[in-house]
C-alpha cells in the first residue's frame, strides 16, 4: 500500500476542485478500490498460479493452460483499470495546478507594476492586459478555482474519458473471464496430448470478489454519468440566467446604452414670444395705466371732504394756524 501513497495525495487534491458527485466518485475509488484491492486482493489471488493444477504430467501443459485460463491476472487487470480510470483525473489536476500557478504569477506581476511610481502608458496597458487574463481565471473567495471556462471543458472531458474507460474495462472483464469463476477449466492446447482438466483454488471466494469489483465498477460508471448530467444542467442554467439578464428591460430612468438619445422640452431664448402681446388701454402699457389710475384715485380722495373730524386736542396756547370758528362752521355747512 505504500506504493499508492503518492497517487492518493494527488487524487486528494483533485477532491478540492471537484463537484459533489465527483467527490463521491473519489470516495468510492479510495475505499472500495484502493483499500479493498490492497488489503484483500493479494490474499485472495496470491495462490492463483501456484494452486492451479491440471491432471497431466506433460511438461509445460499446466503453464499453457494457465495462460489460456487467465490471459491477465484479475488483480493486475483491476490495477490497470484503476490507473487508466485515474489518468483523466490527473490530467485535470495538472490543468488546475497550471491555472493556480499562472494566477499567482499574474498577481505578482500586477503588484510589481502597481508599485511603480510613474504612470507610464505602457504600464497601464500591461495592467489592463493582466486584468483581462485574470478575469478568465475564476477564483473563489477561499482561493480555490471555480469550474468555469477552459477548466470546465477539461473537467467535462475528464469525466467523459472516465466513463468510456470504465465501460470499456467492464466489457473487457466480461469478455475475458465472465462474471463467475468456474472451479474446473477444460484445456486443449499444445503441448497437452488431450483434453486436460485444470482446477482453480477457492473459486467461490474469487467469484464473490469478482462480483464485488463488478458492482464497484458499475457504481463508478453511474456516478460518472450522473456527474455529466449535473454539469450539463449547470451549464444550461448559467446560460439561461445570462440570457435572462440580457433580455431583461432596463429599470425606469435608466438606459441600456451609455449615451442614449433622449428628448427634452426647452423654451427658445433667442426668438420672440409666439403669442401676441396683451392689449393696452388707451395706447398705454399696463404699468403706465396702473400709475394713471392710482393718480386719479389720489386726486379724488384729496378733493373729497371728510364727514367727521375729531376735535383738536386742548392745549395751553392757541395754535396760530387754527381756522376761525366762523370758517369752520362754513366748512361743515
UniProtKB/Swiss-Prot annotation:
Segments of this protein annotated with the region Disordered: 303-333
Superkingdom in the source lineage: Eukaryota
Any one annotated GO CC term: connexin complex
Keyword terms, alphabetized: Cell junction, Cell membrane, Gap junction, Membrane, Transmembrane, Transmembrane helix
Keyword rRNA-binding applies: no
Signal peptide: none
Disulfide partners: none
Entries under Pfam families matching the protein: Connexin
Chain segments annotated as transmembrane: 21-40, 77-99, 149-165, 208-230
UniProt feature, compositional bias: Low complexity: 317-333
GO biological process, one term: cell-cell signaling
Extracellular side of membrane: 41-76, 166-207
GO molecular function: gap junction channel activity
Subcellular location: Cell membrane; Cell junction, Gap junction
Subunit (UniProt): A connexon is composed of a hexamer of connexins.
Role summary: One gap junction consists of a cluster of closely packed pairs of transmembrane channels, the connexons, through which materials of low MW diffuse from one cell to a neighboring cell.
UniProt name for this protein: Gap junction alpha-4 protein
Amino acid at each position: 500500500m505504500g506504493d499508492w501513497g503518492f497517487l492518493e495525495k494527488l487524487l486528494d487534491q483533485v477532491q478540492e476542485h471537484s463537484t459533489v458527485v465527483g467527490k463521491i466518485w473519489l470516495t468510492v475509488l479510495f475505499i472500495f478500490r484502493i483499500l479493498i484491492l490492497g488489503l484483500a486482493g493479494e490474499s485472495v489471488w496470491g495462490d492463483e498460479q501456484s494452486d492451479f493444477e491440471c491432471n497431466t504430467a506433460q511438461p509445460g501443459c499446466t503453464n499453457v493452460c494457465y495462460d489460456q485460463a487467465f490471459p491477465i491476472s484479475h488483480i493486475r487487470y483491476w490495477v490497470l483499470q484503476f490507473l487508466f480510470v485515474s489518468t483523466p483525473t490527473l490530467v485535470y489536476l495538472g490543468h488546475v495546478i497550471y491555472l493556480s500557478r499562472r494566477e499567482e504569477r499574474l498577481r505578482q506581476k500586477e503588484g510589481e507594476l502597481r508599485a511603480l511610481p510613474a504612470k507610464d502608458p505602457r504600464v497601464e496597458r500591461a495592467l489592463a492586459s493582466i486584468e483581462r487574463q485574470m478575469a478568465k481565471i475564476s477564483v473563489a473567495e477561499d482561493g480555490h478555482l471555480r469550474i468555469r471556462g477552459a477548466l470546465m471543458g477539461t473537467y467535462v472531458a475528464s469525466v467523459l474519458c472516465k466513463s468510456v474507460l470504465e465501460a470499456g474495462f467492464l466489457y473487457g472483464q466480461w469478455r475475458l473471464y465472465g462474471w463467475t469463476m468456474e472451479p474446473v477449466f477444460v484445456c486443449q492446447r499444445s503441448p497437452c496430448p488431450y483434453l486436460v482438466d485444470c482446477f482453480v483454488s477457492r473459486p467461490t471466494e474469487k467469484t464473490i470478489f469478482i462480483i464485488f469489483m463488478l458492482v464497484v465498477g458499475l457504481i463508478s460508471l453511474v456516478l460518472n454519468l450522473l456527474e455529466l448530467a449535473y454539469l450539463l444542467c449547470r451549464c444550461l442554467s448559467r446560460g439561461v440566467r445570462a440570457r435572462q439578464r440580457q433580455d431583461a428591460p432596463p429599470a425606469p430612468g435608466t438606459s441600456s446604452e451609455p449615451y442614449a438619445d433622449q428628448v427634452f422640452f426647452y423654451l427658445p431664448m433667442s426668438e420672440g414670444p409666439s403669442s401676441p402681446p396683451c392689449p393696452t388701454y388707451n395706447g398705454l402699457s399696463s404699468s403706465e395705466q396702473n400709475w394713471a389710475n392710482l393718480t386719479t384715485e389720489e386726486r379724488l380722495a384729496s378733493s373729497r371732504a371728510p364727514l367727521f373730524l375729531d376735535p383738536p386736542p386742548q392745549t395751553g396756547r392757541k395754535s396760530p394756524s387754527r381756522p376761525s370758528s366762523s370758517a369752520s362752521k362754513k366748512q361743515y355747512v
